[in-house]
Amino acid sequence: MKHTESLAAATGRLIHSDDSSATVEEVQGLYGPFTFPELLLQRLWAEQTFQVERLQSHSGETVKVSYPGRWNRLAGPDFRDARVTIDGVSKRGDIEVHLRETDWHAHGHSDNPAYANVILHVVLFPCEREVTATGGMGEIPIVSLLPLLWHDLEEYAADDAIATMAARPSERLLGEWMWLPVTEARERLQEMSRRRWESKVRYARLRIEKLGWAEACHHTALEILGYRFNRSGMLRIATRFPLAAWRAGAMDCDAVFEAERETGGWALQGVRPANHPLVRLRAYRGWIGAVGDWPERLRREGLDWPNWDATELTESAMEWRRRVGFKARWMGVMRAIGALDCVPRPRADNLWGDGLLPLLAGAGHLREEQAFDWWRRAWPGDQPDSVKKTLRSLGVASGQTHPLTWGDVQGLLWWRWDQARQATLGRT
């Protein structure tokens, strides 16, 4: 399966705005259509959140990005003073970003002298054109990012909406939930968490189809160790240095870190010392040193998973954890794959919920329904304070009997994504 075929499909409905950066594309997702904004594509370019090593123009020229440019949120090209090398020729100038190549003409750039210094036209969706014609200003090479993205379009859009929600005070998240009885709130969160789970399994399956089991595990682990702000840098490193390179034992984490920093690949401001990407790279090297074939060990753990009965809604998370021996199983899996002493909690809980279980279910090494129970009843992990405070204020998480769970958090996050999705489509 080609990567472009595995991504969410555009419906063909392009929604323009007077502000060109507010243009959005309606895309069909797992639970209905959603919108992918041009502004998000600009952010992907600014952060270089794609497989930069494979970047080529539509005419087949190799494109290397030394500096993606200064993000311009005012009139004119989207990025100023970028530095790129196209087919061995160094160029310095502006970059314009659109969802489709035809937006260049739709937005009236062809004869606008403000765009005379554009050296590269970045678009999301591939097209038949090799260059963008600019009237009297010559021709501009085109690059398409869709085939190079690490994730499904819906996953990028959902993460963007969820990050926006996480930055809000908890009081703003309570409004639509306060009137619900606690039991009903828990039922709704379980429904939303199941949707979140299904989407994560789908994303994991796409990654496995694209990279294979071992490399999908490798990419996922490094991405999670990048925390929120350095996921892209970690993914670039995972692409540049596959699992075999780490297993060979010659990884110089300091040199790898510095090489990525030279290209502006790290976001270090406000990062806690324990979460610093160099610290996490060294931790992953220790992990590989302990169990080099950890993806294979994980596969075996999935196939040998104990087959417990599914959770009843009336059974609390604490009761379920005691019944199935959750802590012992969690530690057993982490120890078997070599991560127990290398990935501290609560980030290890994110590895469990965002990585290990979706990967096992996506590959068919663990039944989805069985994995879902171990996923939603797990420890909550490293989550925004506003989300945790909201769930406690609702009474969903209360004391020892009903501790905060991974599923509670993921259910609330999915609800916010669904609200944002429908709002942008004018359906709320």
What are these regions (language model features)?
Residues 23-63:
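Short Lys/Arg-enriched alpha/beta "domain-start" segment
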Residues 109-114, 120:
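Compact, well-ordered interaction domains used in eukaryotic information-processing assemblies
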Residues 188-427:
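Hydrophobic, aromatic-lined core segments that form the binding pocket/scaffold
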